């Protein structure tokens, strides 16, 4: 079958025609001939029925009959020469056979024959196609030309291309004839036939012909022809052309449709007046129908053109924009006439009717490319459009009361409008005014979003003496929201998108979300006054003039909440005292809002107290009290108690909701229960947000609702819900904040939160994802902690950061140490993780892990972070003997040669164990110890650092520190002390001491070490404790009797703390070898003294977890002199700094209010850490933001630094200067010290936030390069700004009666 007979050619022609008919829908939608060809060329890839077409089957049979023998011969030859083709060799066989076949003579002959035959078939088809086309045109002349308006309404602005009519080609000569026939002087029938032919032609051919210019001119003339059929036909052609033409052509078509002079003449010729009174405009009236069609086609193009005009020269876009603005600016003077006078219907009214929400303008303003041109033209030529829009909003505002009864009905009718016979056809004047108002509001709302748009203001309008400013506009919009009527029952959903209230709120929300907009438009006193005016009225016992009280107040609260979300807005609400309260005092907005919220909760206002409205105002308060500065302002109102009381009341109501009984309406009972439960959850949610700050968490704990709040948070956390609509992050920060305290971690444990985190970790670590496809197996992890486990790792670090958390989750809990572990047995608690991943002391535990090395490395990394907190390490070491376990692991990781000593096997586990052993054994700051890195080096010696398998540590890891001696350099401060006799130390002595201290710190800070610092501290404490004005705590009698305390025993945790303290003291050459008994005696005295000042608390949370690091610091400072140390501590206990520098001092102390003493939340957390976060946000905002993004909190790391007196984070001289600075300068310097340290670490913090290991960095790394003396001046600046607030709050820790 190498040659085709005549019958074969006829059959081919028939099959090809069938194929083209089958794919007609595909190629008819192509915008050009080239695209149609591409569709046919790739038909096999896109058409699943390709191989079922008869034409394709025919060609396949032809190829098989022509080349079948050749392929068989080539296949046989190849297999004989190469052997059997299996596996990947199959591809080689196919490739070789195909190549040889295509090079054969038979293949070339077959292709030549096929090409010649197909060319004849296609030519015959084209000839037959042209004959059919001529016959069709002849038939078209005889058909009825009448087309209804509804047909156009359905089709005039669709995106169909010319291929919908037929797939044909038209010659340029034919288009020239059509252009001549469209001449206005020709008879109507001739022009009609020409339009018919034009509509059937491909638009691409029409637009590319030489006669297009004349053709377009004639089409524009036909568009204005009184005969509606001709103009409709032109619009149909334009509608099809828009979607398939380049912009340089479509902008000419757009200009033809929107010809300003033509349309203006049309409006004036037909005397289209604006309806008045009971009259209406009829969309079915011929002249009006034509205008609506024309405007609709323009509007469709306006909304679509933004997707492609950036690809063309700016001049095309500018022509389109100018044509539009020129058209909409028609009749501006008449349009601005007073409402009662006769005025004309304008293009802006029709575009408002067709595009009520000004979608075209929003799209044009979205991109900078077009927005620049729009704003430039509006400013230079068409500012009247903006003036008219503003005037329309003012007119609507002035007539709101008169329209209030009809507004809802209009909204309901316009919400689902459809112009044409199938929909609405009559529109009253009020409806046109309303849609013009909505359109104007949307235009103005979009305009003020942008800087250059806001520059149009202030704007001078009629009937207003002063120009309208941006602030005036926002006030008008808020008042419109207030005056909108309340939707009746059942209409709320229908009237939602079109109601003025929601439109105004949409604008206000947009402004709130953009900082610059909010600053210029919303953060203004008149705006805040307008928002709060109804609240002030209600607080004075009167009713405000609001058409819908609940709706207006709820929207007001929503706006205020969004304002409070930003720093500038929050500051405006908290500190600008420009409002007058009900009592006539000048107060800030925050005070007014919280007073109103309290009265709402107490139901003391003349308003229908719905839960949604109350919840909205609580949410405004929440946006303030979930920040440190906001809580500072709102705390005096005890809002947490008001919300907690409302929650308790609601909770009891939900318990009393009756069970549905037979015969009772079940829907009502169910709805009531849902409402009560929703209100209860809303109150819990708002209570929970007190936990966003340290002091707020203390307030939450005092309400007694912390367990319920954490359980609620856990339910939202498992659903991956955000904290609120105004929060960008999830619950990470709040969980971390809660986990810092003992009651918080207990609540997290009981809620199931801890178990969820552990299970997620175990699933990621041991289970992993399923390798569904062999071609894409799970990658081998290159990092010790795989990225899939990193989130769980950081969650655990945050959770276990505090020693309280470790104590509550692991204290007095023995490891299971099972003899056998089921492979399917998952870890569900922190104790399980300790047992399965960290303390792996048996083969059973090793065999129970699928990824032993990776999982154990993960466990050791977690252990390393936990051990950074000295108190956590002491607990773990005392219970689980970590050091012995790690040393044994190192000894087991040694080769066993036939003779001599073995060598350490360097692997990930041995390197990690080595790092931990050095970390837990060597104590010191950045210049006092050296920690081995975890990474290996390139070269012959990948790990040159000594491996630790026995104690003591190799000297490589410990720097040599010179012994501190009394020197002449200390004479300056020493001279000051010796010159100050006890009788001369009057009230001014302390001021002199501070000045001398600051002077020496600034010039010779290196001399403030050793004995002179001990002398200075001792004399300062003696002076302050001798003054009744400086004593903060009442005197406590304590008789120092060594024999009575020697019978006391130290716990294993305390004993280990003694060992570490002695090791550090000996390393610093401050202690003798026999100092252990003295330090133990000092600690026992401290315990005895403090135990006499503790309340008896039934809670299990009140045991102090850890060692007394401050007492050990004083012992080292006094060079091991137990007498001087105890004497200083006893005197120091009467001073305010002792409450914050000496953590055990106020643990469960009788000096604290009983509810705080029982909370187990120390003032170091609720006061010091709280103000660290507050000052950090104001002074070092980048660092504060970094903490927020990481899910870690500044309070956590500060509590760890302060709890262990900066041991392992600062060198010994800096620790001594920290203590002395806080005693001499004041306890508030503890806050400034932490802020300074975090400011010093700013670059590192920002870097590690990006690498997602901020918490690990802060806990594991010392504070490199930090010197107290370098930051003392900065701290003095903080003192001048914040002392009055910080120090007064520190003093307020005692009950007021004290």
Curated annotation (Swiss-Prot):
The keyword Oxidoreductase does not apply. InterPro entries: BROMI_C, BROMI_M, BROMI_N, PHAF1/BROMI, Rab-GAP_TBC_sf. It is found in: Cytoplasm; Cell projection, Cilium. Residues 1171-1283 form the Rab-GAP TBC domain. One of its GO terms (biological process) is non-motile cilium assembly. Disruption phenotype: Fish are viable during embryogenesis and early larval stages, but exhibit curvature of the body axis and hydrocephalus, and curled cilia in distal kidney tubules. Gene3D superfamilies: Ypt/Rab-GAP domain of gyp1p, domain 3 (1.10.472.80). Keywords: Cell projection, Cilium, Cytoplasm, Developmental protein. One of its GO terms (cellular component) is cilium. The keyword Zinc-finger does not apply. Coiled coil: none annotated. It holds the Pfam family BROMI. Required for high-level Shh responses in the developing neural tube. Together with cdk20, controls the structure of the primary cilium by coordinating assembly of the ciliary membrane and axoneme, allowing gli2 to be properly activated in response to SHH signaling. Interacts with cdk20, which promotes cdk20 stability and function. This is Protein broad-minded. It comes from Danio rerio.
